[in-house]
């Protein structure tokens, strides 16, 4: 019950590219992003960092590194345009350069999560942060 309350708090007031990211993840994996990846492993979700537990968690680690390279906008809050065409994510051509980067980061993690669905391990779905070992920097 406490976990559901925490997830609800995390979702309040969320807009911008996080919502777009969650939509991309659902489109690519068929999984609800917040529920399945919000606290997955050591790297999926806000404020989580550590040595990846598996390939799924590695997708999130690489995504965080991708966001660190973005300058000029807020990757978690600023909205961008994209479309879903023929079961593929297409980042909008009219996005400013910074938001093109954010969209490409989000697209890459969504595809990575789909490609690694076979490594998804339910024991890491709500993984305790204290069990995460320090990871290398990006």
Swiss-Prot record:
- CDD domains assigned: PLA2c
Q: What is its EC number?
A: 3.1.1.4
Anything else known:
Is expressed in Amami-Oshima P.flavoviridis venom, but is missing in Tokunoshima P.flavoviridis venom.
Question: Can you cite an annotated GO cellular component?
Answer: extracellular region
**What molecular functions are annotated in GO for this chain?**
calcium ion binding; calcium-dependent phospholipase A2 activity; phospholipid binding; toxin activity
Query: Which residue positions are annotated as catalytic?
Result: 63, 106
Name the Gene3D superfamilies on file. Answer: Phospholipase A2 domain
UniProt note on tissues of expression? Expressed by the venom gland.
A GO biological process of this protein is: lipid catabolic process
SMART domains linked to this entry: PA2c
**Which keywords does this chain's UniProt record carry?**
Blood coagulation cascade inhibiting toxin, Disulfide bond, Hemostasis impairing toxin, Hydrolase, Metal-binding, Myotoxin, Secreted, Signal, Toxin
Q: Give me the comment on cofactor binding.
A: Binds 1 Ca(2+) ion.
Q: Which cofactors does it use?
A: Ca(2+)
In its UniProt entry, the species of origin is given as Protobothrops flavoviridis
Q: What is this protein called?
A: Basic phospholipase A2 BP-III
């Amino acid at each position: 019950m406490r976990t559901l309350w925490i997830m609800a708090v995390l979702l309040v007031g969320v807009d911008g590219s996080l919502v777009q990211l969650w939509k991309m993840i659902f489109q690519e994996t068929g999984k609800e992003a917040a529920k399945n990846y919000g606290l997955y492993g050591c790297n999926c979700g806000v404020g989580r960092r550590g040595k990846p537990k598996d390939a799924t968690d590695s997708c999130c680690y690489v995504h965080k590194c991708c966001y660190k390279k973005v300058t000029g906008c807020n990757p978690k809050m600023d909205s961008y345009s994209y479309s879903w065409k023929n079961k593929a994510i297409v980042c909008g051509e009219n996005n400013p350069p910074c938001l093109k980067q954010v969209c490409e980061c989000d697209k890459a993690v969504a595809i990575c999560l789909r490609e690694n669905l076979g490594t998804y391990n339910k024991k890491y779905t709500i993984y305790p942060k204290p069990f995460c070992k320090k990871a290398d920097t990006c």
